[in-house]
Each structure stands twice: as C-alpha cells, then as structure tokens.
Design a protein with these regions (language model features):
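Nucleotide/pyrophosphate-binding catalytic subdomain
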Residues: 1-180
C-alpha cells in the first residue's frame, strides 16, 4: 500500500495559529493522508520537567502540571469554534490529563521515575495533541498508534518490531480514510 504521511513537529502544533495552518495544509490535499503530530510546542520538555519535580518530592510539580492543563484547554478554546464539539474534546482531553495527573501523583508519592513511566508520561503529549488536531481537521479519523506500532525489548531498551508493525499498519489503514 502507498501511503502519504505528513509529520508536523511541536512548532507546527505549538499555537492556535499554527494548528489552524496545519488544518489548511492537510485539507488542501486531495488524496488520503496520514497526519502525525508531535506534542504541542514545548510540552514534552514541560512534561519531563514536571516528572523530575515529582520524582524529587517537589510539590510544585502540581503547579507545573496545572500549566500543562491550562495550555491544552487554551488551545482547544482557540481551534474548535463549535461549542458542543469543543466541550466534547475538552472532556476527552481532561480524561487523559486526569490519568496523567494520577501518574505524576504516584511518581511524587514513591519518589521514583522508571524509564517506562517516563515514556508513558511523554506519550501523553502526542496523544493529547493528536486528539485535538484530529478534531480540528475536517474528515479526520483518530488512530491510537499504540495499537499498531509494536516494540520488542532488546538490551534494556525497546526497538520497533518492524515486521509486526508493518503488518498492523497495513491492516489498520486498508482502506485508508481521507485523513487519519
């Protein structure tokens, strides 16, 4: 299968205006396209900083986390004009942010941040950004990449299992929706 994939980094999804530019770019493309987005600009660093603060027993991690929450809600406010849709997206994003808040609380309570927990925390940036952007672009369908990108552990780190991942990608995107 031939798939057109467009990757937008953090700067491309760092503000209301930049997300609206991504919308224009993607919607102007005639053929089906897969859109991959990073976390909102600066969020990955903020997620890691908050995790570090929680690990070190610094209760100010809660303030950092509340800034992460506010940033996402502000972006949603700016990119989704329809009130009903905006409220629904806010609910979905808040559900993810509540999960993330619980993870931070656990890290704070046990003063420990494993590599797996750190990776999980960072993943929320992309997951939330994807949720927002998929609700901004017309005809977009959200896919959770955790369902088709698989890894295997090798020497204490995870590497992509390309054989399984490629098969799952083909199964997931056949037929390919207009925007995913």
């Amino acid at each position: 299968i031939f798939m057109k994939v467009m990757k937008f980094g953090g700067t491309s999804v760092g503000s209301v205006d930049s997300i609206l530019s991504v919308k224009k770019i993607v919607e102007a493309i005639e053929e089906p396209v897969i859109v991959v987005v990073s976390a909102l600009g600066g969020i990955t660093d903020k997620l890691l900083k908050t995790a570090s603060m929680a690990t070190n027993g610094d209760v100010a991690y809660e303030r950092e986390f509340s800034e992460i929450v506010a940033r996402h809600l502000d972006v949603i406010q700016g990119v989704i004009p329809d009130k009903t849709k905006r409220i629904e997206v806010q609910k979905q994003v808040m559900a993810l942010l509540d999960e993330l808040g619980n993870i931070y609380k656990g890290v704070y309570l046990i003063n420990d941040l494993s590599a797996k927990t750190s990776d999980t925390i960072v993943s929320y940036g992309e997951r939330i950004s994807s949720l927002i952007v998929s609700n901004v672009i017309n005809e977009a369908k959200l896919f959770d990449s955790r369902k088709f990108i698989k890894t295997v552990k090798q020497f204490n780190k995870h590497i992509v299992d390309f054989e399984l991942t490629n098969r799952l990608i083909e199964e997931t995107f056949d037929p390919l929706p207009k925007v995913s």
